[in-house]
Amino acid sequence: MSFIEEFINKGYFHQCTDLDRLTTITKETKIAAYIGFDCTATSLHIGSLMQIMILRLLQRHGHKPIVIIGGGTSKIGDPTWKDEARKILSKEDIAKNAKGIKKSLSKFIKFGDGKSDAIMFDNVEWLDSLNYLEFLRDFGVHFSINRMLTMDSVKLRLEREQHLSFLEFNYMLLQAYDFYYLSKHYNCSLQLGGSDQWGNIVMGADLIRKISRKEVFGMTTPLLTTSSGAKMGKTAAGAVWLNEDLLSPYDYYQYWRNCEDADVIRFAKLYSELTSEELNEFERLAAEDINAAKKKLAYELTKLCHSEQAAKSALETAVKIFEQGEIDESLPTVVLEQALLQTGISAYELFHDVGLASSKSEARKLIRGKGAKINDKLVEDENIIINTTFLLDKNAIKLSAGKKRHILVRV
C-alpha cells in the first residue's frame, strides 16, 4: 500500500490541491513534507496526534518529515478560527515550549541525518531576519487582500465584529513564506495540516508557483471530535498531554480506556499501527466485548507513546484498582506538606488542590453528586476535615473522583 493509499485508508484525508498528481509523485520518488506546530505549551497533546502519526507514516514510507516549530509565528498568533487574539509569548517561553514539543515528537519519529530522518526547525531562524521593506516588495505583491478577506477564518471574526489586528493578519503571509523557504532550501513539496489551515496552505503553494515555478502540494486532514462532539485533546480535567511530566502514562492509558464506545474502532484506525488483519480482529473483539477492545486500544496507544513497559504497568495498575480493589503504588501521587494535613483541610478544598476538580465549586458539586471517595468510602460531607488520621498503612490517602480517576496523597 502506498503512502497516499494508507493515508486515505486510515482516515487522514480531507482535501488536496491535486490528489492524483501527488499520488503519482509519491509512488515514483521520495519527497519532503512538512507540518507546523505552534509553541504554545511545553508538550503536544492528543489533539496533535493525527498530525504526528502522519509524520510517522511519511517516515515509514521513506519520505522525509520536516517539522516546523513555530517560534516566529508564535510571536504573532494564528487567527484561524479563534474568537480573540492569542497572548504573545516571550522568547524564553517559546524556547522552553520548543524543547518540550521536540520531546513529544521524538516519541514517534526519528530525527537525524539519514534520507528519511526527520529534521526540525524553528521558523524564527528565517523570520527574525526578514527585512520588512524587502518582504513587502518581493512577496507582498503576490497576496490578494480581496482573497484573504474571503477566507472563512478571517470572515468569521469580521462578521462578529471582533478585533482582528494587522499583526494577526500577517500570520498567513508568514506561514506562506515558511512553505516557500522550505521549498527553496530543503526541496519540500508538500505541506500538511488540519482542514482549518487550508487557506494558509493554498496561499503558500500559490506563492511558490508564482515565484519559483515549482510543483508543490497542500493536503489537509479532517478536524476531529469525539462521537459526542467533544474536541480531541481536552477533558474536564485538562489536556491529554503526550509528555509524561505533564500526564502520567497511567492517566494516558485511562483516557483511551474510557473513550466512548462509538470511537473505539475509529481511534484504533487513526492512532494505532495495527495491521489490516489485526484491525479486522479488533473489530470482531469490539463487537463481542467492547471493554476488552478498549483495554487493547489503551494498551497499544500507551505503548506507542510511552513504551511497552509503561503500557504493561498502566494495565497492571488498572487491574489492581478496578478488578482487585487494591491501592497501587504507581497511581498518580500528590505530595502535601505535613503541616497541612496535621492542621487539616476540608474535603472539597483537597479535591480541588490535587487537581481532581477544576474549581472549588466543581469540587463541591462532585461531592454533592456522590462522585467523591476517600479511601474507597463515599464522601458525604464536603466540609469534613481531612487530616493525618486518614493516612492508610502505606502512608497515603486515596482520593477518587468518579470510577476512573484516582490520586494518592502523601506527606
Curated annotation (Swiss-Prot):
Location(s) in or outside the cell: Cytoplasm
InterPro entries: aa-tRNA-synth_Ic, Rossmann-like_a/b/a_fold, S4_RNA-bd_sf, Tyr-tRNA-ligase, Tyr-tRNA-ligase_bac-type, Tyr-tRNA-ligase_bac_1
GO cellular component, as recorded: cytosol
UniProt keyword Signal present: no
Motif 'HIGH' region, residue numbers: 39-48
PROSITE patterns: S4
Catalytic activity: tRNA(Tyr) + L-tyrosine + ATP = L-tyrosyl-tRNA(Tyr) + AMP + diphosphate + H(+)
Binding annotation for ATP: K234
Keywords from the UniProt entry: Aminoacyl-tRNA synthetase, ATP-binding, Cytoplasm, Ligase, Nucleotide-binding, Protein biosynthesis, RNA-binding
Family matches, as Gene3D superfamilies: HUPs (3.40.50.620), RNA-binding S4 domain (3.10.290.10), Tyrosyl-Transfer RNA Synthetase (1.10.240.10)
GO terms for biological process, alphabetical: tyrosyl-tRNA aminoacylation
Chain ranges of the S4 RNA-binding domain: 345-411
A Pfam family that the UniProt record links to this protein: tRNA-synt_1b
Family annotation (NCBIfam families): tyrS
Stored PANTHER family: TYROSINE--TRNA LIGASE, MITOCHONDRIAL, TYROSYL-TRNA SYNTHETASE
Family: Belongs to the class-I aminoacyl-tRNA synthetase family. TyrS type 1 subfamily.
Subunit structure: Homodimer.
Entry-linked HAMAP family: Tyr_tRNA_synth_type1
Name listed for the protein in its UniProt record: Tyrosine--tRNA ligase
Protein's organism: Rickettsia akari (strain Hartford)
Encoding gene, per UniProt annotation: tyrS
